């Protein structure tokens, strides 16, 4: 019958081979025991909205993350946290509140900040999708802290210094800014997919906790200032480069001890140890290399 008579056209059966393959792959992916996300921690720095925090908690629960830490939240009433979390009440119940970012990431072997702003100290290592596999692998033997900044202006440079690596979320240049819950959901989703795609394997290296790495950077800062390597008016300019270099490499506890020894030796040399060294060289008959002109 024609469509003019009010009848529907005959249904045409088109095999959705591509869709079927994709669905089967996703089902098999979820059945495969993947890597664990229990060591992944979401850190919200100075969040302004209780509802946003609740939405982040829900996104975390959807994707299998359970550690949530707030740094100096700018709200008191937690009603909307619980309301927006819906069935993620257990995440909210275990949520910690701390006074500073240092306390939130002190035990983390890897601290990853999220940024949408470009700048000298804000060059991301990659997108959330690109970094997710290595973050999941690191989380098998380390606490991995994922740091999100305030809703209004993101992470400050002081916050960024605690981050070993930075990631970004690509978005349309027409409106590239995501709200807090959206950003958290995207990152958690990429971690979830990466975890499911990677079968459980042997544990990787255990990295030094962030508090020890930060202590190292402070010692290096003092040592470099002692020998005039850093500009006294802006010492953190060059030090940020060291943070990025060593952050990309990943430092084990043994590495931190070696670099602390280097910092102590630099301080000793800058405090007059060079004179003792010169005297020993003269006694040993070693001639110092001539200065370059």
Where in this protein do the model-derived segments appear?
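Post-transcriptional modification and biogenesis factors for structured RNAs
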Residues: 3, 7-293
């Amino acid at each position: 019958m024609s469509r003019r008579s009010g009848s529907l056209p005959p249904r045409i059966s088109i095999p959705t081979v591509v869709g079927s393959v994709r669905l089967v792959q996703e089902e098999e992916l979820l059945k495969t025991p993947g890597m664990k996300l229990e060591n992944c921690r979401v850190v919200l720095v100075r969040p302004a909205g209780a509802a946003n925090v609740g939405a982040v908690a829900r996104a975390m629960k959807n994707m299998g993350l359970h550690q949530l830490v707030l740094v100096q939240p700018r709200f008191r009433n937690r009603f909307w946290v619980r309301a927006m979390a819906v069935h993620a009440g257990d995440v909210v119940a275990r949520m910690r509140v701390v006074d500073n970012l240092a306390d939130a990431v002190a035990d983390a072997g890897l601290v990853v900040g999220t940024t949408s702003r470009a700048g000298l100290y804000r060059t991301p290592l990659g997108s959330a999708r690109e970094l997710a596999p290595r973050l999941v692998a690191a989380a098998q033997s380390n606490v991995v802290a994922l740091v999100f900044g305030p809703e209004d202006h993101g992470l400050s440079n002081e916050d960024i210094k605690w981050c070993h690596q930075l990631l970004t979320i690509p978005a349309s240049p027409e409106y590239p800014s995501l709200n807090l819950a959206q950003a958290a959901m995207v990152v958690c989703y990429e971690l979830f997919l990466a975890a499911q795609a990677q079968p459980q394997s042997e544990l990787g290296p255990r990295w030094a906790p962030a508090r020890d790495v930060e202590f190292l950077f402070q010692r290096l800062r003092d040592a470099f200032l002692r020998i005039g390597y850093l500009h006294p008016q802006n010492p953190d300019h060059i030090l940020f480069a060291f943070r990025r270099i060593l952050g990309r490499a990943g430092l084990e506890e043994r590495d931190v001890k070696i670099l602390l020894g280097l910092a102590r030796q630099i301080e000793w040399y800058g405090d007059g140890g060079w004179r003792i060294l010169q005297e020993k060289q003269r006694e040993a008959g070693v001639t110092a290399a001539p200065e370059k002109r």
